[in-house]
């Protein structure tokens, strides 16, 4: 009977958590309790704020909504103007560097596109010249005295 008792006690002792695990569990429990308390306080404050401020917001909404709309449009306009100004300044700076030959990023693509356009225009001009000569000979064949 004593052996059984010692065997059971040994199993219980083997499965008990060590002090580090106990300290970790206590820390976890305390942190969870604090976060739960803060969540409750936040929710309570939000509900109280809504209960107090909702009648005020409804009463002043004919004034607040147009003011908020005007402020939103004004801020959006200023931010857009600043963004467009920055984009224009960047484009002018890039163009200045390109004209001065400082080789800004993307200049190779611009040069390649310019050469392709010039090459295509040259091919179109040659084709038009050939086709124009062909039409001229057809006109002379159709009306020899013309």
Curated annotation (Swiss-Prot):
GO cellular component labels: membrane; monolayer-surrounded lipid storage body
Pfam families xrefs: Oleosin
Q: Which residues carry this modification: N-acetylalanine?
A: 2
Q: Which key words tag this protein in UniProt? A: Acetylation, Lipid droplet, Membrane, Transmembrane, Transmembrane helix
UniProt keyword Transmembrane helix, yes or no: yes
Entry superkingdom: Eukaryota
Motif Proline-knot in this chain: where?
Answer: 55-66
Q: What is its main location?
A: other
Instruction: Identify its membrane topology class.
Output: Multi-pass membrane protein
Report if keyword Transmembrane helix is assigned. Answer: yes
Q: Where in the cell is it found?
A: Lipid droplet; Membrane
Q: Name one GO biological process term.
A: lipid storage
User: Which tissues does it occur in?
Assistant: Expressed in pollen (at protein level).
Recorded hits in InterPro entries, A to Z, give: Oleosin
Q: Which residues cross the membrane?
A: 22-42, 56-76, 77-97
The domain comment in this protein's record states:
The proline-knot motif may be involved in targeting to lipid bodies.
Similarity comment = Belongs to the oleosin family.
Could you identify this protein by its name?
Oleosin
């Amino acid at each position: 009977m004593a052996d059984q008792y010692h065997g059971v006690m040994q199993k219980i002792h083997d499965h008990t958590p060590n002090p580090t695990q106990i300290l970790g569990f206590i820390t976890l429990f305390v942190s969870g309790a604090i976060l739960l308390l803060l969540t409750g306080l936040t929710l309570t404050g939000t509900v109280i704020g809504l209960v107090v401020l909702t009648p005020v917001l409804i009463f002043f909404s004919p004034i607040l909504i147009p003011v908020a709309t005007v402020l939103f449009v004004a801020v959006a306009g200023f931010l857009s103007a600043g963004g467009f100004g920055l984009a224009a300044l960047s484009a002018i700076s890039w163009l200045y560097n390109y004209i001065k030959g400082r080789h800004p990023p993307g200049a190779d693509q611009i040069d390649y596109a310019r050469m392709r356009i010039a090459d295509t225009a040259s091919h179109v001009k040659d084709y038009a010249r050939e086709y124009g000569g062909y039409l001229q000979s057809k006109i002379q064949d159709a009306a020899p005295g013309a």
